[in-house]
From Swiss-Prot:
<dbReference type="InterPro" id="IPR011598">
    <property type="entry name" value="bHLH_dom"/>
</dbReference>
<dbReference type="GO" id="GO:0003677">
    <property type="term" value="F:DNA binding"/>
</dbReference>
<keyword id="KW-0805">Transcription regulation</keyword>
<feature type="region of interest" description="Leucine-zipper">
    <location>
        <begin position="81"/>
        <end position="102"/>
    </location>
</feature>
<protein>
    <recommendedName>
        <fullName>Protein max</fullName>
    </recommendedName>
</protein>
<comment type="function">
    <text>Transcription regulator. Forms a sequence-specific DNA-binding protein complex with MYC or MAD which recognizes the core sequence 5'-CAC[GA]TG-3'. The MYC-MAX complex is a transcriptional activator, whereas the MAD-MAX complex is a repressor.</text>
</comment>
<keyword id="KW-0804">Transcription</keyword>
<feature type="domain" description="bHLH">
    <location>
        <begin position="23"/>
        <end position="74"/>
    </location>
</feature>
<feature type="region of interest" description="Disordered">
    <location>
        <begin position="105"/>
        <end position="160"/>
    </location>
</feature>
<dbReference type="GO" id="GO:0071339">
    <property type="term" value="C:MLL1 complex"/>
</dbReference>
<keyword id="KW-0238">DNA-binding</keyword>
<feature type="region of interest" description="Disordered">
    <location>
        <begin position="1"/>
        <end position="40"/>
    </location>
</feature>
<dbReference type="GO" id="GO:0045944">
    <property type="term" value="P:positive regulation of transcription by RNA polymerase II"/>
</dbReference>
<keyword id="KW-0010">Activator</keyword>
<keyword id="KW-0539">Nucleus</keyword>
<dbReference type="Pfam" id="PF00010">
    <property type="entry name" value="HLH"/>
</dbReference>
<dbReference type="GO" id="GO:0046983">
    <property type="term" value="F:protein dimerization activity"/>
</dbReference>
Length: 160
């Protein structure tokens, strides 16, 4: 992309061929002045877009340096925010999973309340222990080793 893409100027081909050298030079100077003005306006716009330079006088080199620093800062900030979003999505998925498990447990508890344990709802597991039909068919008994608690991944919570 060239600097002249945004500038509408008449090309030399549209001018009559009988121009004098002075006219050609004047036309070329006008085109060059427009190009320089466009670059100057672009630097002013860039300067005003960088928070640390707004309203200050700065050289073109300073404007480019500060703009580069600001872009890098914003990239880091964007990356951090994206990590926070990913962490929150994982936490949300875990919470939704817990909600589904609790709703399932609640509906199981309601079923147990509606159908009290009777002889037909009690079964014997392979070890000879009596279990309820609502236990989910676990083969473990109270004599066996206790199940290890499920470990849950704790998500780091950072205040932003």
């Amino acid at each position: 992309m060239s600097d002249n893409d945004d500038i509408e100027v008449e090309s030399d081909e549209e001018q009559p061929r009988f121009q004098s050298a002075a006219d050609k030079r004047a036309h070329h100077n006008a085109l060059e002045r427009k190009r320089r003005d466009h670059i100057k306006d672009s630097f002013h716009s860039l300067r005003d877009s960088v928070p640390s330079l707004q309203g200050e006088k700065a050289s073109r080199a300073q404007i480019l340096d500060k703009a580069t620093e600001y872009i890098q800062y914003m990239r880091r900030k964007n990356h951090t925010h994206q990590q926070d979003i990913d962490d929150l999505k994982r936490q949300n998925a875990l919470l939704e999973q817990q909600v589904r498990a609790l709703e399932k447990a609640r509906s199981s508890a309601q079923l147990q309340a509606n159908y009290p344990a009777a002889d037909s709802s009690l079964y014997t597991n392979p070890k000879g222990s009596t279990i309820s039909a609502f236990d989910g068919g676990s083969d473990s008994s109270s004599d066996s080793e206790p199940d290890e608690p499920q470990s849950r991944k704790k998500l780091r919570m950072e205040a932003s």
